[in-house]
């Protein structure tokens, strides 16, 4: 059995196979998933699992070079403040794009992870970095 936090075999394999610059998307329950990327559906019921929980575990396994979230997720938050579902989890502030652009970009992802999150715009694109 693995010693690290990520026990989901399919997700572990996807992360291990990522190359530099490859995209992995963690999405809320309503994010449309295009036909191209691998679909990893973790949604059990509304709110379970949360994006924050999945993001925490993914970040324990994946070297992330940069991240993107939808501008709409920030809404009226003060400058520099992030939505609760990603607050304190990323090494650097994520870039922002429109929700429509994030959906377009997700078509190029290696995989899209669907969570049970029901918070609007709780979606994040992670770009794989290198460990050297």
UniProtKB/Swiss-Prot annotation:
Its main location: cytoplasm. Pathway: Carbohydrate metabolism; D-ribose degradation; D-ribose 5-phosphate from beta-D-ribopyranose: step 1/2. One of its GO terms (biological process) is D-ribose catabolic process. The active site is at residue 20. One of its GO terms (molecular function) is D-ribose pyranase activity. SUPFAM superfamilies: RbsD-like. It is an enzyme of class 5 (isomerase). Keywords: Carbohydrate metabolism, Cytoplasm, Isomerase. Pfam families: RbsD_FucU. It catalyses: beta-D-ribopyranose = beta-D-ribofuranose. It is found in: Cytoplasm. Disulfide bonds: none annotated. Substrate binds at residues 28, 99, 121-123. Its EC number is 5.4.99.62. GO terms for cellular component: cytosol. Homodecamer. Belongs to the RbsD / FucU family. RbsD subfamily. HAMAP family: D_rib_pyranase. Catalyzes the interconversion of beta-pyran and beta-furan forms of D-ribose. This is D-ribose pyranase. It comes from Variovorax paradoxus (strain S110). The lineage of its organism: Bacteria, Pseudomonadati, Pseudomonadota, Betaproteobacteria, Burkholderiales. The gene is rbsD.
């Amino acid at each position: 059995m693995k010693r690290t936090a990520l026990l989901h075999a399919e997700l572990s394999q996807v992360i291990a196979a990522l190359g530099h610059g490859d995209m992995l998307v963690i999405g809320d329950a309503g994010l449309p998933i295009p036909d191209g990327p691998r679909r990893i559906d973790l949604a059990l019921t509304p709110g379970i699992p949360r994006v924050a929980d999945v993001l925490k575990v993914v970040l324990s396994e994946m070297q992330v070079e940069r991240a993107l979230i939808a501008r709409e997720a920030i809404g009226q938050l003060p400058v520099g403040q992030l939505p609760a579902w990603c607050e304190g989890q990323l090494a650097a502030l994520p870039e922002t794009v429109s929700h429509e652009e994030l959906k377009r970009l997700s078509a190029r992802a290696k995989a899209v992870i669907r969570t049970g999150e029901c918070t609007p715009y709780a979606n994040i694109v992670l770009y794989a970095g290198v460990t050297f």
